Amino acid sequence: LKWKGGKGDLVRDFVDACLKHGVKPGIYLGIRWNSFFGVHDFKVAGSGEMQGNRQAYYNQMVEGMVTEICTRYGPLFEIWFDGGASHPEKGAPDVLPIVKKLQPHCLFYHNEQLAEARWGGSESGTVGYPNWSTFAYNYTGSGESAPSGISKNGFALLKHGDSLGKYWVPAMADAPLRGHGGRHEWFWEPGDEAHIYPLNNLVDMYYKSVGRNATLILGLTPDNTGLLPEADVQQTLLQADYVSA
């Protein structure tokens, strides 16, 4: 690798940049799918001994990766598993005890055992009103692993929480910055600056997330230079100026 002589560490650079600017670093990991190992919904494709060996190797790789993330970069604010992390009793990687042992103050989101925060039920940057931080379950699951009540009425339980819930599971309202005008793109592509949300949309998201007792997570991703596009940066600064005015 030519970049930094093959000795670069993107996670280190990211965490250092966060700390430099007073931002608590969090890490987003995807372990539900892996094309190299042929993994779909946490399971390696195939059957028999070969499948079992590949599944064991994949689990070992994932658990090693999570251990590395939890030990090399100091305290983390949150680890977010995209699509969750399945239950180890189903043969999936066992990541919860690793995070809890090595990052005891880090928010864990999420598997079929625990969710210390919850997805807000859409990728619109908003939640419903009212929105309670209390919840009926201490996990949210995903797909078929989700508790039966979660998917009812358009994910109403995720969008509103439960005023009588006994678990503290506050909502996160996520949206990609480049999600305007019929586009919904979490990753950078050239020539789609027209799909950056206008300021009035971003302000509306703020009022309907932070203003409704949720955290707004706005998706920005680097371009092919490794930096955040200037147009994206300027638009988020406009939002910040409006909110702080």
Task: Annotate the PLM regions.
Residues 1-245:
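Mature catalytic domains of secreted/periplasmic carbohydrate-active enzymes
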